[in-house]
Amino acid sequence: MWKKKIVLSFLFYLISALGISLTIQAGIGVSSFNAFNVTFATLTHLKVGTVTTAINFAFLGTCWLLDQQRKIQDYLIILVALIGFGFVINFFLYQLFGSLVFQNYLVKIVLFILGTIIAGIGTGQVVALGVLQFPIEKFCTLISERTRYSFQFYRYLVDIFCVSLALGLSIGYHSPIFVREGTVISLFLLVGRESGGNSVFYEYKSRNWNPNERISVFFK
């Protein structure tokens, strides 16, 4: 059963990465965390998946330092999943979708919504299985446990920081701005927040959320 959960968790982790790739490919802006990733990747000429993995590594390392109940096995599994996560984003963005250009704005909207839904469902399944965690959400959980502020408070702070940094870099270096209408759309599509996903699922999980309800609460 444990091995099956690990395999399924990896699968849905990668499905989430596929969804994120679609939102980026749509070209109408991305969620807060991904806005920073794409902006930084554009400025440094690195691949988006590589940047996403590197930043998640940084959060995971911080979690390791904060987590008093850390288990090497759990962190190694997340580490491997993050590598696959970045690889899938790079594969879809630069190989499978690399030559695709969408001119029709309605098509872009549909593609973005589809990607957001896929990413959210993948994330919800990962959290429901309870094997893998997403570094940013884990970081916010660990911080909230040590302070009087809630998980949501810190998750919003991360979002605000990412958006502010993305805008600052774009304006300062005169590069494309990725905080656009897609960023707003993502907030209305998901109940709560996403990071290429996702804190809402942690909130429900922490309240003994029934996994069978995950689809019904995913949409507003």
Where do the model's predicted regions map?
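Core subunits and conserved enzymes of cellular information-processing
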Residues: 1-220
